[in-house]
């Protein structure tokens, strides 16, 4: 691991690593709160993120890094409940070679609880990440390059005293009807539906919600009539964290970087057909165990059960490989109430 704050002075930084041989998955971790974000392996030309908050007690920061040897130019558009905004100061912005820039989004999108952004790169390519502060609680919003009409959101808490929301941004020209089907143990929960106008944002509250009982973690299946970007926001009245909806992959890595362990960890097959999943568990660079399991259509399986106990995931790295890009890995950190800090698996390439 690398702690850049031991190497330089400054409030914001970017880190670029060159790997000689083999391949790696990397993650940035907030050492205080345990929240983390997968690192990118290349710059992109279009990037979306949702669920930002600039109300009193919160701040939303956008950081962009230019990984190339030539200058890059980009625009930023915001999507709010009231419509879209293209702040003049965030149009045609230039980023020098191997330079990093940060912007306080709240200076332009003032006192807005739920908004999304789109970064459009006009020249070159960029790596982008959002940094959301909520009452002193920090989390990373690593966003996405692809909008989705469907997604699976595992491990969404319904615990008492917890907060759970699905925040949605619609960057497209047509309104979207978004339906959330909530799977929660033996309970039958009515679908939660919201309308998201063109170039707008909206929110569905999962917890607290009188239609959804407090019964552990729910799996939510999202369906939308138009491609959208969604973020799960969880926490308590003392602060919230943001977790972008994961993109299914064929190879996913779950790493307990801090050594604090996981409360729950699951793998979900989002395909309508069953698949085989092989796994390799490593601890301190050494092979601990391996195995293979079958995973049914749209099924979720506990990773603790898979490897023989939750304790075996503590301080370890688990690599799961499927037959196609249909796997989503999610985990929750150990918190009170349970499930209020989510973390995602890393794309294993």
PLM regions with names:
Residues 225-226, 273-274, 280-327, 332-341:
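C-terminal beta-sandwich/jelly-roll accessory domains of carbohydrate-active enzymes
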Residues 11-21, 113-123, 214-226, 311-324, ...:
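Short, aromatic- and glycine-rich surface loops/edge beta-strands on solvent-exposed regions
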Residues 1-12, 83-116, 185-215, 219, ...:
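Intrinsically disordered, low-complexity Pro/Gly/Ser/Thr-rich segments with frequent PxxP/GP/PP motifs
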Residues 18, 63-86, 120-122, 162-189, ...:
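Short acidic, flexible loop segments centered on an aromatic residue
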Residues 12, 57-63, 71-73, 88-90, ...:
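Transmembrane beta-barrel architecture of outer membranes
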Residues 24, 82-84, 99, 124-139, ...:
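Extended macromolecule-engaging scaffold surfaces
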Residues 47, 55, 73, 77, ...:
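Solenoidal tandem-repeat scaffolds enriched in leucines and small polar residues
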Residues 22-68, 125-172, 227-272, 325-349:
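Conserved functional hotspot residues at active sites or interaction interfaces
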């Amino acid at each position: 691991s690398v702690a850049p704050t031991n190497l330089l002075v400054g409030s914001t930084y970017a880190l670029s690593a060159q790997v000689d041989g083999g391949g790696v998955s990397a993650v940035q971790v907030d050492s205080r709160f345990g929240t983390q974000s997968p690192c990118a392996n290349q710059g992109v030309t279009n990037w979306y993120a949702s669920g930002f908050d600039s109300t009193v007690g919160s701040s939303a920061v956008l950081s962009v890094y230019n990984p190339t040897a030539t200058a890059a130019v980009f625009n930023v558009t915001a999507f709010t409940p009231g419509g879209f905004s293209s702040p003049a100061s965030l149009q045609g912005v230039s980023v020098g070679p191997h330079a990093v820039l940060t912007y306080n989004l709240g200076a332009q999108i003032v006192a807005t609880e739920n908004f999304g952004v789109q970064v459009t790169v006009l020249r070159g390519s960029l790596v982008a990440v959002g940094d959301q502060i909520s009452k002193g609680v920090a989390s990373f919003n690593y966003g996405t390059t692809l909008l989705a009409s469907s997604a699976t959101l595992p491990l969404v808490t319904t615990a008492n005293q917890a907060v759970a929301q699905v925040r949605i941004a619609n960057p497209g020209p047509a309104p979207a009807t978004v339906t959330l089907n909530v799977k929660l143990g033996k309970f039958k929960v009515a679908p939660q539906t919201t309308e998201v106008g063109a170039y707008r944002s909206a929110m569905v509250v999962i917890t607290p919600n009188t239609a959804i009982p407090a019964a552990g973690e729910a799996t939510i299946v999202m369906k939308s009539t138009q491609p959208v970007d969604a973020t799960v926001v969880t926490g308590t009245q003392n602060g919230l964290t943001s977790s972008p909806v994961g993109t299914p992959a064929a190879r996913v890595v779950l790493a307990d970087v801090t050594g604090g362990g996981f409360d729950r960890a699951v793998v979900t097959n989002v395909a309508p057909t069953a698949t085989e999943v092989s796994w390799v568990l490593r601890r301190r660079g050494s092979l601990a165990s391996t195995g293979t399991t079958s995973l049914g259509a749209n099924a979720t399986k506990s990773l603790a059960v898979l490897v023989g106990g939750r304790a075996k995931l503590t301080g370890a790295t688990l690599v799961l490989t499927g037959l196609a890009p249909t796997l989503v890995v999610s985990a929750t950190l150990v918190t009170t109430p349970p499930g209020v800090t989510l973390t995602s698996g890393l794309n294993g390439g």
